[in-house]
Curated annotation (Swiss-Prot):
The active site is at Y153. Keywords: Cytoplasm, NADP, Oxidoreductase, PHB biosynthesis. Its EC number is 1.1.1.36. The lineage of its organism: Bacteria, Pseudomonadati, Pseudomonadota, Gammaproteobacteria, Chromatiales. It comes from Allochromatium vinosum (strain ATCC 17899 / DSM 180 / NBRC 103801 / NCIMB 10441 / D) (Chromatium vinosum). It is found in: Cytoplasm. This is Acetoacetyl-CoA reductase. Substrate binds at D94, Q147, F148, G149, Q150, G184, Y185.
Length: 246
């Protein structure tokens, strides 16, 4: 029977590649998006169908514990219990700390970090009971090294690492692995829209002299979602072209 995978933030640039890769690998894939993206999600679903992928979309504000619980309950009832969770939802509210307001801080922490707890908590018990689970948290190179103007984002992404390592210890003997991936710069609509000088400056600082393709991030996730990674837990995979080495 196909394993069921939920990808939060699943209709974004990286999320799309994750969804299609997991579907190619034989998973039944469910994408999540914010309720405000419902219209875009319908177009996204049709575009994936045209590519040969039948991917369901469930809306929920994953920064809300109650809405996350509702979503997972509906997925379980309509599709089945979730075997693979990819926590990919994320936003930025970049400001220098001098200009950062509480709203900027809370928005990023709520979506980028609290959502990881909110959704994982809904699937955790079932994974333990069934003796199998894969939880993959999408962090960032900036959660390892920090980034000017991203105190909120860097803190949230760094928090994922502690969460991952702690939870991995609780699931290890039960067949549930918990890992993190830390991408560097990825070629998405957002990075392609950058000023050429800014983009070229970023690329010059990457040892591989290019940004990652979304499919390269998805390939790493596919490995962590599969059986061959069953002995890996509590780990962080840096997929950053050598931008940060630790």
């Amino acid at each position: 029977m196909a394993r069921i995978a939920l990808v939060t933030g699943g209709i974004g640039g990286i999320g799309t590649s994750i969804c299609t890769r997991l579907a190619k690998d034989g998973c039944t894939v469910v994408a999540n998006c914010h309720p405000s993206e419902a219209a875009a999600a319908e177009e996204w679903k049709q575009a994936r169908a045209a590519e040969g992928f039948d991917i369901a979309v469930f809306t929920a504000d994953v920064s809300s514990f109650d809405d996350s619980a509702r979503m997972v309950r509906e997925i379980t009832e309509q599709v089945g219990p979730i075997d693979i969770l990819v926590n990919c939802a994320g936003i930025t509210r970049d400001k220098t700390f001098k200009k950062m307001e509480q709203a900027h801080w809370e928005a990023v922490i709520n979506v980028n970090l609290n959502s990881v707890f909110n959704v994982t908590r809904q699937v955790w018990d079932g994974m333990l009971e069934r003796g199998f689970g894969r939880i993959i948290n999408i962090s960032s190179v900036n959660g390892q090294r920090g980034q000017f103007g991203q105190a909120n984002y860097s803190a949230a992404k760094a928090g994922m690492h502690g969460f991952t390592m702690a939870l991995a210890q609780e699931g290890a003997s039960k067949g549930v692995t918990v890992n993190t991936i830390s991408p560097g710069y990825v070629e998405t609509a957002m990075t392609l829209a950058m000023n050429d000088d800014v983009r070229n400056s970023i690329i010059s600082g990457i040892p591989m002299r290019r940004m990652a393709q979304p499919d390269e991030i998805a390939a790493a996730i596919a490995f962590l979602a599969g059986d061959e990674s069953g002995y890996m837990t509590g780990a962080n995979l840096p997929v950053n072209g050598g931008l940060f080495m630790h």
